[in-house]
Amino acid sequence: MWIKGKAYYEGEIKEICINFDRSIKEIRANCKPDMTFTNEELILPASVDLHVHVRGAQLSYKETVATATSEAVYGGVGVIVDMPNTVPYINTPERIKERLREFQLYSRTDYGIYSGVSKEVEEIDKLPIAGYKIYPEDLEKEETRYVLEKSKKLKILHPEMPFVSKIERSLRRSYWMETAAINLVKGNMHITHITNFETLQLAKSMGFTTDITAHHLVVDGERDCISKVNPPIRDYVTRLKLFLKGLFEVDCIASDHAPHSKEEKRMNFDLCPPGIAGVSFSTPYIYSLMFKGLISIDRAVSLLSGNPSRILNIPTGKIKEGYRANFTVIKRENWRYTTKFSKVTETPMDGFSLDAKVTNVIVEGKLAFDGENVYPIRGVNIFDSSSRS
């Protein structure tokens, strides 16, 4: 298949033709295209979200693989990586295989999964996973030592101390809860959903890769259960500093998409589960900043596609021959954010004014989203080398 249009290619915006099946075969100036995009549209590498809670399995009342990945392509995301804290918890070879089968049947994006920490690390390491997720409570477990010492795969850390769940939320506001946790880990480590600039500086100085979420930049405080999240939304000054400085030093943007049912989010604040569903917000938000002139296109593509692909070591994130044929097409258009395909219908970003609109998404060379509809394509496990042929 050939497509033609303006694209971000080799660090510039150029009018090009791209030939592909599941991977990009050829790029040249002229062709007889099967699909042509307008002058208002821009072809970009599809976004890669390395921190998503898909739910599914026994938590399908919150979200399913189909609804989460449909919401992802609506938001311009071509690869998601799923966290293990569903029910049942994913940290055995058998459960990993079951989880991968669930994705194989229902995912509209390319995908990967993390395992939880486990003493079965040698067997799990043989499976096509993205790596391991380390939660605060894991820092006290013997299984975590096994993972840190025996696996060379990526480890992704939720940077808070183990005892944070036992104290008042307001006391977690101090950034030392994050920095103290970072000092307990080593190796091929990624520090996720950082909420303040000091934590980011420390993580980078230790050679770790990093991400921040869009909601930790734009949401104005924890006003109710809809905006309750872990780690918590910080004060205005902390968020402003993270935006003004952190956005230019962090490696990537991740959504930490964490859906819950409407009934759960209507519980008393002390009882309702933390989590914001934002897998479809990150990409239009970052490209809106680009259209406003606040960040460059190079920086935007790096945050959403290039750097997460590098961190995960997967062949995405660039429009380049041999890379996966995963594209996000956007145009400049003002609109108000809302979820569309997720089971979650309320987020603290609802009504947020955006200037970038996703018009098309192609995953594995197939049209996954056309601006209105999501199509039942099947993504592949991007960490399984046999799926890349």
Curated annotation (Swiss-Prot):
Reaction catalysis annotation: (S)-dihydroorotate + H2O = N-carbamoyl-L-aspartate + H(+)
Residues bearing the modification N6-carboxylysine: 133
Single GO biological process annotation from the record: purine nucleobase catabolic process
UniProt cofactor note: Binds 2 Zn(2+) ions per subunit.
Annotated binding of Zn(2+) 2, by residue: 133, 158, 193
SUPFAM superfamilies: Composite domain of metallo-dependent hydrolases (SSF51338), Metallo-dependent hydrolases (SSF51556)
Entry keywords, A to Z: Hydrolase, Metal-binding, Pyrimidine biosynthesis, Zinc
Pfam families reported for this sequence: Amidohydro_1
PROSITE patterns documented for this protein: DIHYDROOROTASE_1, DIHYDROOROTASE_2
Binding site for Zn(2+) 1: 51, 53, 133, 256
Metabolic or biological pathway, per its Swiss-Prot or TrEMBL entry: Pyrimidine metabolism; UMP biosynthesis via de novo pathway; (S)-dihydroorotate from bicarbonate: step 3/3
Cofactor names: Zn(2+)
Leading EC class: hydrolase
Similarity remark: Belongs to the metallo-dependent hydrolases superfamily. DHOase family. Class I DHOase subfamily.
Task performed by this protein: Catalyzes the reversible cyclization of carbamoyl aspartate to dihydroorotate.
Name listed for the protein in its UniProt record: Dihydroorotase
Organism: Sulfolobus acidocaldarius (strain ATCC 33909 / DSM 639 / JCM 8929 / NBRC 15157 / NCIMB 11770)
Organism taxonomic ancestry: Archaea, Thermoproteota, Thermoprotei, Sulfolobales, Sulfolobaceae
Gene expressing this chain: pyrC
